[in-house]
Amino acid sequence: MLAITALAGLDLAQWQALLNNVAFAVCLGAMLFYWGGAAFPQVQLLSELGLAGMIGANLTIAALLTARWIDAGYFPLSNLYESLFFLAWGITALHLLALHWTRSRWVGVTTAPLATGVVAFAALALPADMQEAQPLVPALQSNWLMMHVTVMLLAYAALLVGSLLAIAFLIVTRGQEVQLKGNSLGLQFGPSQPATHPEWTEATLPSPAAELVYAGIRSPRPAEPPPQPAPEGIPLQRLSLAEILDNTSYRLIGLGFPLLTIGIIAGAVWANEAWGTYWSWDPKETWALITWLVFAAYLHARITKGWQGKRPALLASLGFGVVWVCYLGVNFLGKGLHSYGWFF
């Protein structure tokens, strides 16, 4: 009863500080539960607790952003602290989406550390004055703030999670070339084959991009190529996990790329209204273009060249670093029109 009374007496700033710490604790707990579930797969409860932790983290971060929105009077995307928490919220939301697609604990093993790291950086590494809500600078007092920044951060979240799953694919396959079930679009042609692992069929669902590419096509489907033997040293269970990681990575990148495109276009329109030019080759703009080109090359290679497995995973791994440079790295320069809210 005393605890409830104490919580009821907190103001919005105190609620934000509390939710800040709770979000980190819940993310850390979810990560540890997922890792425990991977180490002891017979204990199903561990993975279920990891899922509960990621749901809790998503709701806690949403509550934190809502409290900050009410307290500050604007949507909380004006500085690095706020954008990091929104990015973490996007990562946890996409984790839940990917888990819905795959039903695989290994998605959580991969994505929970990413969410935990982002929240830890925001909650523990940033100075206290950076975590306080500040009045919007004139350039950010626009309705375009929510449109441009939210879409860009959701794009970053999708691309980061998708790229991280591609890195996990390379680890699982030990960097070897493997023959995956189905084609690079995530479709199975010809008669369906019995699954060799409980999670195999979930990994072969068509990606959003594949559904668009093959919509309306009525030509006969080619027969599925004969199965290839597993590379030496890679068990069949690892190959089924690799299939899950490859297809889920592709689907998330296929989701993040159009969001990135929309975000860049919205930013260009906003820039023209604020500064009188659509494009000024600001460092952030330049790296956003580089990010777009990297993932455009990834999707082009998969859709038109039929790439799958190792080669697109390497390209996505490059994209993982490029996204971080675009989001955080260019802020180290302290220059340009996008240098708001850095702590140097």
Swiss-Prot record:
GO CC annotation: plasma membrane-derived thylakoid membrane
Membrane topology: Multi-pass membrane protein
Listed InterPro entries: Cyt_c_assembly, Cyt_c_biogenesis_CcsA, Cyt_c_biogenesis_CcsA/CcmC
Listed GO MF terms: heme binding
Keywords, sorted A to Z: Cytochrome c-type biogenesis, Membrane, Thylakoid, Transmembrane, Transmembrane helix
GO biological process, one term: cytochrome complex assembly
Chief location category: membrane
Bilayer-crossing regions: 21-41, 45-65, 80-100, 106-126, 151-171, 252-272, 287-307, 313-333
Cellular compartment(s): Cellular thylakoid membrane
Subunit organization: May interact with ccs1.
Family, as annotated: Belongs to the CcmF/CycK/Ccl1/NrfE/CcsA family.
Function: Required during biogenesis of c-type cytochromes (cytochrome c6 and cytochrome f) at the step of heme attachment.
Classification via HAMAP family: CytC_CcsA
Name this protein carries in UniProt: Cytochrome c biogenesis protein CcsA
Gene: ccsA
